[in-house]
């Protein structure tokens, strides 16, 4: 992770962005789901299905953290914010893990706030509640042709499964650093 925050935010929820269903499982757009799955496994969480999302609660340093995978498809990810708000989770207490096509595969960066930069999942979150959330931007690369972006992010990774797993491990390590004192 190439950026450190002056003050570590109190994270109460980690949202992994992606699309539901086996068709999209191992795709660049689902890197958020894959990383949150790995966090859940590391901390022995158990996924529970709700109407529009899947969630698990984990404990890190005696702090409960809600892991969330919206099931509304990427472009409607922001619909989850109402449910999180009812649970007392504000945007400034959320870490959103998402694919970043403007980064080469493997680059990971932490960013507070900002625009969607063309990412429809972020656009939906911002439209439903603002941009105060923290982002873990995970580089998945970009196709040579701009017209191929939609296909690129929803097709299987071009990188090997091992390379993707190494990226997931690095992202989980970065999340652990963020969450531990």
Question: Which functions belong to the PLM regions below?
Answer:
Residues 1-113, 123, 127-134, 143-150, ...:
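Nucleotide and nucleotide-moiety/phosphate-recognizing core
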Residues 118-121:
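Hydrophobic alpha-helical segments within soluble ligand-binding/sensing domains
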